[in-house]
Amino acid sequence: MNKKAIFTQVSQLEERIGELHRELGGLKEQLAYLIEENHFLTIENEHLRERLGEPELEETEEKEQVTKERKPFVGEGYDNLARLYQEGFHICNTHYGSLRKNGEDCLFCLSFLNQD
């Protein structure tokens, strides 16, 4: 193989890698959007179910008490991690503490923040 053919092949490979990188970035954005949309739809679903089945007052009070007992308290640590993420740092175990590139969302960090 001559040098020109090798150079051409490397250039073509570089272009394909660039295209794949752009495509992967687009898929990552779509996935982040879908995760966020799923989270909001889940919340909306819960609210609609609550409205549809509005039980008697006593049952509602009992359910609220059980719900309060089940829900874990969101503490100061969670707030600190959310603040760090908003400031542009990773909070996932994979890249913890490093800066997020170009302020892009990290799916691992988002899944950590959206845990129930």
UniProtKB/Swiss-Prot annotation:
GO CC aspect terms = nucleoid
Q: Quaternary state and partners of this protein?
A: Homotetramer. Interacts with both DnaA and DnaN, acting as a bridge between these two proteins.
Gene (name only): yabA
So what does this one do?
Involved in control of chromosome replication initiation. Inhibits the cooperative binding of DnaA to the oriC region, thus negatively regulating initiation of chromosome replication. Inhibits the ability of DnaA-ATP to form a helix on DNA; does not disassemble preformed DnaA-DNA helices. Decreases the residence time of DnaA on the chromosome at its binding sites (oriC, replication forks and promoter-binding sites). Tethers DnaA to the replication machinery via the DNA polymerase beta sliding clamp subunit (dnaN).
Task: Give UniProt keywords alphabetically.
Answer: Cytoplasm, DNA replication, DNA replication inhibitor, Metal-binding, Zinc
Q: Which residues form a coiled coil?
A: none
Read off the HAMAP family from this record. Answer: YabA
The protein's location, in the record's own words, is: Cytoplasm, Nucleoid
Q: Does the keyword Cell membrane apply?
A: no
Q: Return the similarity comment.
A: Belongs to the YabA family.
Where on this chain does Zn(2+) bind?
A: 90, 92, 106, 109
Per its record, how is this protein called by name? Replication initiation control protein YabA
Which organism does this sequence originate in? Halalkalibacterium halodurans (strain ATCC BAA-125 / DSM 18197 / FERM 7344 / JCM 9153 / C-125) (Bacillus halodurans)
Cofactor(s) recorded in Swiss-Prot or TrEMBL: Zn(2+)
Biological-process GO terms, alphabetical = DNA replication
Cofactor: how bound: Binds 1 zinc ion per subunit.
Q: Which InterPro entries match?
A: YabA
> Does this UniProt record's set of keywords contain Metal-binding?
yes
Matching entries from NCBIfam families are given as: PRK13169.1-5
